[in-house]
């Protein structure tokens, strides 16, 4: 019922708005010529005219044939006085008859009084009209919004470069009737009701107003039960208070329900319309409408006794008001169809008025605008050498800094400066020598409001007054008399003056000033305009052209708008968006995109519609090798027990997923598959078994509908899954729980119909009987698959295209997609309007252009690529246009950007269909593939549209040609229908990109042995089964890789056992340097020592050994060593590969055997020999791989540092260090010779003491150990930190520790 009432209210408001629009449009006869019937004095101009005033009429051919000023410059204007306020709906222009003088563009201004002019605006910008191309043709413009004014000005902007300014003009419209009331700031109009209370379900209040002040109450009404409605000006903005039947919400304690408008104290007319139907309301200020819902408990507004306009009088206290009264004029004031001002004029008994008059008295205030921050200034003369000075004026600005006033004082008194610095007013009197005087006052004065300033100096004291609040007077420190100067410079300084005449330590002022007084005398600024008083540069006289660039607010997604005089900025902090207008999301649109950018599992924010209106939502992305699961948690994932519920008193739980339903729907709709698990445990608690078919328990999904199907069943069938399969505990029922047994049973299963997910409510009504109880759990929402990221099509002909509805993006437009092609050029997409258009194309094999026209001329952006874009690889394009800038991005190439004009924000008006892959002319179409097309964040389903069009095929194969490089460490790219995956079979790593290291902790007694007698069955690539490592033939190329971390030296890392007692061992010597010891042919063993750097330092190090024929290269971290065998050496058939301690010691090289006694204590990761990953086989495929594990092997990540206690224990120096014959070809540049005898002696002493301490510690620990430890392989563990885990491994060493103890003794 509430939704129906809300819909009713919205429909009524829409119809009401259309009715008001119809009233405006119904005046279709308002197009009569207005200027032709007036006397010649109707026309006037800025300065000289070549002929009489009457010659400016349209089609005038006599005399000079029109208006043409002597000087053609930007200060000229032609003005028409239409006698009274009229409604102007159109204008027309011609050039001067029989001449080469015409205007090619112009602006319109209008005024009620001939002063305080106002620009005609359209689309929130000062509108420029297209003028004439010759002297005789008439160019007619119908105004989008009519003007109501007495005076109209035509202001030429550009004219024929081969002639001068010349115009003949006409204005079209009709008479305008209005009822006006003038409020002096102390008066009100009261509309008394015939009954005590006026109760209304619908209200329409409309009026127009012009205000002299920034604050004041326009209307107010209230009731005894808390109802109230108030419209109030607050600092130049309209604040609306509206409350229905809520006694707690009093006007004095509430905040405005809606705030709209800005700069409404500009003494121009502004329109207001308030429409309410029940709790639904529309509030419109100057054609900008905001819809809102009122506060309160009922739909009726109950107002007692009266409505007041212009103020809130206090009952029984005449002349007393609750808030500041309105000072200004109101026009055409209507309350629910009643013309309030007309009743007051006719002195009807319902109206009680204070000091209200019925004509608008407007003071002749002339404002001026300082336009340029470098060259604007106003010079006004003063009376020099007066004892003291007095200057006052009002200003308004958006800039924090600017010069307000500079004047050179007489008699060596110095220079007086008044500047705005950081929004604070600062008065300085600077002396030629010595210190001056300084006064500061105010803050935030760049708020766009009018502020009054007064400076008074007498004798040696100076007073600065801001907004009638005087700052502390400052004495002039020199005690010297202050004398006034002869010239006062406002806003800036001319370029030709010295610093003593006009000093400006800051940039010129940009803003408005008015009511300038010097020596208590007002200055006539019209005389300044006419050249008879003072001097000026870059000023607009008789208008204040301040504009609120934050209204409307172009900062999207909650971005905060800040502005200066010329532009605005968006602060996007904490919004989740970035860019000039906070348009671009900083988050990706799905877990698939995070995977594509190299991320692994974790919590991420997902913004399903990108730059669209939906905000980001936190999800968990479980990115694995086969599927990518997106999980959204809710507020009740634990098992919940329920008792005492009945149909009369049901149990209900609402699930909160941390986001709106629209966000969740977008996530689900963008996924291929979604599910939620339900576990319902029951004891004498039924689900569906009722006599009338009404379920006892149900759940509610996304569309707010009840769903009584459970556990694997299907919609529309009121059963559980076991009922469909006929497998319930009691086949007489369709659910296990419906058997109503005293024992616990359950119905558990998955909901997977996307149109019904997510589960939002659970309702249970059958747990109020004896021993009746239920327990339920709804799992998180889980989805996989991305319907958008791999949504691709192929265009096969230049004439083929896809068409979509018109792209609506008036102020913000972003387009992104991937493409690949072999063609030389082609149009990606195009959308046309009457004048506007946008086009995105590959103009050459290395260039992409984005062309857009929003009505002010085409803008073309170009990105040139240093590599060809037609290489049949996927490339990414993103084009964006907003009111601040236009940009084009291709791949990761430099961004092409063009800033927009600050003077106008044009809407993009497109009318045709959007053509993708081609153009409306079916020429220059794109040949190739496109995918993942997004328009303003919304996905465009290319595949579905391609099914309806010829020449376009759904899908596009060949992803691995672009993305195979994403598969690392030997991983292989595998094509999929939608995208690709990485096969990590031949990689020592795992994960979606084969980047996740597989690593394990080793005890001194741990041994991992991989046997090579036969290939193991885990290998997925059958071609590897014939690898030479399984045969008796030798390989010419071999590769060994491993990462290690240890604090033990000496130690053994890896051992390769070949036939005929040949071997290769990777060791750390006693000083921690890396050694490669091998015997690959008959003869003695050889050893390569890579470096004397201590690698047993608790950090991860990487070793890679590559053999190619007689050459062998060894890379250790960032160092590379190269060697050549002196004789032919081959890697013969391997028998086994051992990590850690070698268990088969028969025939073991004596030197290796000595190190092998200690085993390996530390961490190994990413171990690989050719295509074999022995550590991965031991941890992932131990049941089928030919691998044997002895001792404790614990899976854990290798950390980069170890606990300090570990480092203190494990560096062991042994006198039994294996020594062998050094290869003669080992490079001397990468080795360090033996230490001196003195250093060796010191080390020996330190080593002996260390051995003793370690031996005592090990004996103490050994007494607390088990007497026997069986060989085992631990299952996968994830310790919180490696340091703690590693320390425990060392502290709890097994029997190998005993061996080490005996070895040291």
From Swiss-Prot:
Residues making up the signal peptide according to the UniProt record: 1-24
A Gene Ontology BP annotation from the UniProt entry: cell adhesion
Keyword Chloroplast in record: no
Lineage: Eukaryota, Metazoa, Chordata, Craniata, Vertebrata
Domain Fibrinogen C-terminal: 584-790
UniProt name for this protein: Contactin-associated protein like 5-1
Keyword terms: Cell adhesion, Disulfide bond, EGF-like domain, Glycoprotein, Membrane, Repeat, Signal, Transmembrane, Transmembrane helix
Annotated membrane topology: Single-pass type I membrane protein
Domain of life of the source: Eukaryota
Transmembrane segments annotated in the record for this chain: 1238-1258
Localization per Swiss-Prot or TrEMBL: Membrane
Residues bearing carbohydrate: 282, 496, 571, 622, 1057
Its job: May play a role in the correct development and proper functioning of the peripheral and central nervous system and be involved in cell adhesion and intercellular communication.
Domain Laminin G-like: 180-360, 367-544, 791-956, 1014-1198
GO cellular component: cell junction; membrane
Domain F5/8 type C: 25-174
Domain named EGF-like: residues: 546-583, 957-995
Disulfide bond entries: 329-360, 512-544, 550-561, 555-570, 572-582, 929-956, 960-973, 967-982, 984-994, 1163-1198
Family: Belongs to the neurexin family.
Matches recorded under Pfam families: EGF (PF00008), F5_F8_type_C (PF00754), Laminin_G_2 (PF02210)
């Amino acid at each position: 019922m509430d939704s129906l009432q809300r819909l009713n209210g919205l429909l009524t408001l829409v119809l009401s708005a259309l009715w008001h629009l119809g009233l405006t449009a119904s005046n279709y006869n308002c197009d009569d010529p207005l200027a032709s019937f007036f006397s010649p004095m109707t026309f006037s101009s800025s300065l000289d005219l070549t002929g009489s005033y009457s010659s400016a009429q349209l089609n005038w051919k006599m005399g000079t044939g029109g208006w043409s000023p002597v000087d053609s410059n930007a200060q000229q204007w032609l003005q028409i006085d239409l006698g009274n306020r009229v409604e102007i709906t159109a204008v027309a222009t011609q050039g001067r008859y029989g001449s080469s003088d015409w205007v090619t563009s112009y602006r319109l201004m209008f005024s009620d009084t001939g002063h305080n002019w106002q620009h005609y605006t359209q689309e929130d910008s000062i509108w420029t009209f297209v003028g004439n191309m010759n002297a005789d043709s008439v160019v007619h413009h119908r105004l989008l919004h009519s003007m109501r004014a007495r005076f109209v000005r035509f202001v030429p902007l550009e004219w024929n470069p081969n002639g001068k300014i010349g115009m003949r003009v006409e204005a079209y419209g009709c008479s305008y009737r209005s009822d006006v009331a003038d409020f002096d700031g102390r008066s009100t109009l009261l509309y008394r009701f015939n009954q005590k209370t006026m109760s209304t379900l619908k209200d329409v209040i409309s009026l127009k107003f012009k205000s002299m002040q920034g604050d004041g109450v326009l209307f107010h009404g209230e009731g005894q039960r808390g109802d109230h409605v108030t419209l109030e000006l607050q600092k130049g903005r309209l604040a609306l208070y509206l409350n229905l039947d809520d006694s707690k919400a009093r006007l004095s304690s509430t905040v405005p329900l809606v705030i709209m408008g800005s700069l409404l104290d500009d003494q121009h007319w502004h329109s207001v319309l308030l429409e309410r139907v029940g709790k639904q309301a529309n509030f419109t200020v100057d054609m900008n409408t905001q819809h809102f819902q009122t506060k309160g408990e009922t739909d009726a507004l109950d107002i007692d006794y009266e409505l007041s306009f212009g103020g809130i009088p206090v009952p029984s206290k005449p002349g007393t008001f609750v808030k500041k009264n309105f000072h200004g004029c109101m026009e055409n004031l209507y309350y629910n169809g009643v013309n309030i001002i007309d009743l007051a004029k006719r002195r009807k008994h319902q109206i009680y008025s204070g000091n209200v008059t019925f004509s608008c008295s407007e003071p002749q205030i002339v404002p001026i605008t300082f336009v340029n921050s470098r060259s604007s200034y106003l010079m006004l003369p003063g009376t020099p050498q007066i004892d003291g000075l007095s200057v006052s004026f009002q200003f308004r600005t958006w800039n924090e800094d600017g010069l307000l006033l500079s004047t050179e004082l007489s008699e060596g008194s110095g220079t007086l400066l008044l500047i705005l610095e950081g929004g604070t007013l600062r008065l300085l009197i600077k002396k030629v020598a010595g210190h001056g005087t300084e006064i500061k006052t105010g803050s935030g004065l760049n708020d766009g409001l009018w502020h009054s300033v007064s400076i008074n100096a007498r004798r040696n004291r100076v007073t600065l007054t801001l907004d009638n609040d005087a700052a502390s007077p400052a004495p002039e420190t020199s005690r010297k008399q202050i004398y006034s100067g002869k010239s006062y410079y406002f806003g800036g300084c001319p370029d030709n003056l010295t610093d003593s005449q006009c000093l400006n330590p800051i940039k010129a002022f940009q803003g408005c000033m008015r009511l300038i007084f010097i020596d208590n005398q007002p200055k006539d600024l019209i005389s300044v305009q006419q050249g008879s008083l003072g001097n000026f540069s870059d000023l607009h006289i008789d208008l204040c052209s301040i504009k609120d660039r934050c209204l409307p607010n172009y900062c999207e997604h909650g971005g905060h708008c800040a502005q200066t005089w010329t532009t605005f900025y968006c602060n996007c902090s904490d919004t989740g968006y970035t860019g000039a207008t906070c348009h671009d999301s900083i988050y990706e649109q799905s877990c698939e995109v995070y995977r594509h950018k190299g991320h692994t599992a974790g919590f991420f924010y997902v913004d399903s519609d990108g730059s669209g209106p939906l905000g980001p939502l936190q999800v968990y992305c479980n990115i694995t090798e086969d599927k990518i699961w997106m999980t959204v948690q809710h507020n009740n994932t634990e098992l919940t027990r329920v008792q005492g519920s009945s149909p009369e008193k049901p149990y209900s739980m609402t699930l909160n997923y941390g986001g709106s339903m629209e966000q969740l729907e977008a996530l689900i709709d963008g996924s291929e598959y979604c599910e939620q698990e339900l576990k319902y445990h029951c004891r004498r608690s039924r689900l569906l078994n009722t006599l009338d078919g009404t379920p006892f328990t149900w759940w509610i999904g996304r569309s707010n509908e009840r769903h009584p199907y459970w556990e694997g069943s299907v919609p529309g069938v009121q059963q559980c899954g076991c009922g469909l399969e006929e497998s319930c505990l009691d086949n007489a029922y369709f659910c296990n729980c419906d058997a109503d047994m005293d024992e616990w049973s359950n119905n558990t299963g998955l909901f997977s119909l996307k149109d019904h997910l997510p589960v939002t409510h659970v309702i249970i009504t059958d747990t109020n009987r004896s021993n009746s109880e239920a327990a339920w759990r709804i799992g998180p929402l889980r989805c996989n698959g991305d319907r958008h990221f791999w949504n691709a099509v192929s265009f096969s002909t230049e004439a083929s295209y896809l068409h979509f509805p018109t792209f609506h993006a008036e102020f913000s437009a972003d387009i992104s997609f991937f493409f690949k092609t072999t063609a030389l050029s082609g149009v990606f997409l195009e959308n046309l309007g009457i004048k506007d258009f946008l086009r995105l194309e590959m103009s050459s094999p290395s260039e992409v252009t984005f062309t857009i026209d929003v009505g002010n001329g085409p803008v073309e952006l170009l990105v040139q690529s240093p590599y060809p874009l037609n290489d049949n690889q996927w490339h990414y394009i993103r084009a964006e246009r907003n009111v601040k800038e236009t940009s084009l991005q291709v791949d990761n190439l430099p961004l092409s950007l063009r800033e927009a004009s600050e003077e106008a924000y044009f809407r993009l008006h497109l009318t045709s269909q959007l053509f993708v892959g081609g153009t409306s002319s079916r020429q220059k179409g794109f040949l190739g593939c496109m995918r993942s097309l997004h328009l303003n964040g919304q996905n465009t389903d290319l595949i579905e549209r391609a099914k309806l069009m010829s020449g376009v095929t759904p899908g596009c194969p060949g992803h691995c040609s672009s993305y195979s490089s994403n598969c690392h460490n030997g991983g292989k790219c595998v094509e999929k229908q939608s995208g690709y995956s990485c096969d990590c079979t031949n990689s020592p790593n795992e994960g979606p990109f084969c980047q996740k290291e597989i690593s394990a902790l080793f005890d001194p007694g741990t041994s991992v042995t991989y046997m090579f007698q036969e290939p193991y069955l885990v290998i997925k690539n059958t071609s590897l089964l014939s690898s030479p490592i399984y045969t008796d033939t030798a390989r010419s190329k071999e590769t060994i890789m491993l990462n290690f971390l240890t604090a033990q030296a000496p130690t053994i890392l890896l051992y390769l056992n070949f036939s005929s007692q040949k071997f290769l061992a990777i060791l750390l010597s006693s000083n921690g340097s890396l050694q490669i010891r091998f015997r690959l042919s008959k003869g003695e063993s050889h050893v390569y020592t890579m470096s004397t750097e201590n690698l047993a330092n608790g950090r991860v190090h990487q070793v890679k050994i590559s053999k190619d024929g007689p050459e062998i290269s060894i890379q250790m971290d960032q160092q590379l060593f190269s060697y050549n065998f002196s004789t032919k050496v081959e890697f013969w058939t391997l028998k086994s590969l051992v990590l850690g301690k070698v268990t088969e010691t028969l025939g073991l090289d004596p030197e290796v055997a000595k190190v092998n006694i200690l085993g390996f204590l530390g961490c190994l990761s990413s171990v690989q020999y050719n295509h074999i990953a022995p550590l991965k086989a031991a941890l992932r495929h131990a049941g089928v791989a030919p691998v044997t594990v002895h001792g404790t092997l614990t899976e854990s990540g290798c950390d980069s540092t170890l606990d300090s206690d570990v480092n203190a224990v494990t560096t062991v120096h042994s006198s039994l260090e294996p020594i062998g014959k050094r290869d003669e070809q080992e490079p001397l540049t990468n080795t360090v010779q033996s230490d001196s005898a003195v250093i060796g002696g010191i080390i020996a002493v330190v080593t002996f003491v260390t051995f003793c301490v370690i031996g005592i510690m090990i004996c103490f620990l050994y007494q607390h150990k088990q007497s026997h430890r069986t060989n085992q392989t631990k299952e996968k563990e994830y310790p919180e930190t490696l340091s703690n885990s590693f320390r425990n491994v060392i502290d709890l060493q097994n029997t190998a520790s005993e061996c080490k103890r005996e070895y040291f003794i």
